[in-house]
From Swiss-Prot:
Gene Ontology terms describing biological process: dTDP biosynthetic process; dTTP biosynthetic process; dUDP biosynthetic process
Cleaved signal peptide residues: none
Annotated residues for binding of ATP: 10-17
Family indicated by similarity: Belongs to the thymidylate kinase family.
Natural source organism: Prochlorococcus marinus (strain MIT 9211)
Gene symbol of the encoding locus: tmk
Listed Pfam families: Thymidylate_kin
Protein name stated in the entry: Thymidylate kinase
Amino acid sequence: MKGHFIVLEGIDGCGKSTQISHISKWLPQSGLMPKNANLYITREPGGTTLGKSLRDLLLHEHETNVPAPLTELLLYAADRAEHIHSLIQPKLDKGDWVISDRFSGSTLAYQGFGRGLDINLIRRLDAIARQGLVPEITIFLKISVLTSMRRRAKKSADRMEAEGEGFLKKVASGFSRIANEEHWITIEGEQDQALVSDEIKLAITNKLKNYISNN
C-alpha cells in the first residue's frame, strides 16, 4: 500500500511548524498509520540537500543578489521537482507517510497573488514539477495579516517575510481563494494551539478514514 501525503499551508506566522510538531507525535499513535510505516517531516523550500541551497538562495541571500520574480518562480519549481523525485515519491512508494510544510499552494499564493505572476504559467510549471503527485490532505491554517505581523514581530524575517504588509495581504487573499477552489480543509488559526491541533487531528482522521475505506 502506498503512503499518504499531507500538506500544511498558510501565511507566515500561522502556526504550521507548531502544528506539524503536534501531528508528528500523534499520527504514529493514532491507529491510522500501518505499524510498518514511517513518518517523514519535510518542508519547501529546503526538503533536500539541493533544496537547502535553493532555500538559502531564495530566502536568505543579500539584498543586492535578489532573484527576479520569474527566476524566483523557476527556482521554487526546481526545488519541488527535486523534492518529489528525491524524497516524497520514494517514501510514498515504500508505504511511508510524508507531511510537508508548504507545497504547490504556497507558490500560487506568494508568486502568483503576491508577485503578480501569471497564474496559468505557475500552474503549468507546477504540474511539470509535481509529475501527477497530489496531496491527499491540504490543511490551510487561516489567520489575519495583523496576527501574522504580531506573531513575527520579535523574530528575524527572511526575504519573503520582509516584503511588508501590502504583499502579505495579497498572499493571504490568494491563500483564501486557493483554499476555496481546491477544497482544502480550512482551520481557524487564531484559536488556542490545542484547539487548532484537535481540529487538525479530527480532519485528518475523517479524511483518511473515508479515503482508506474507498480504496
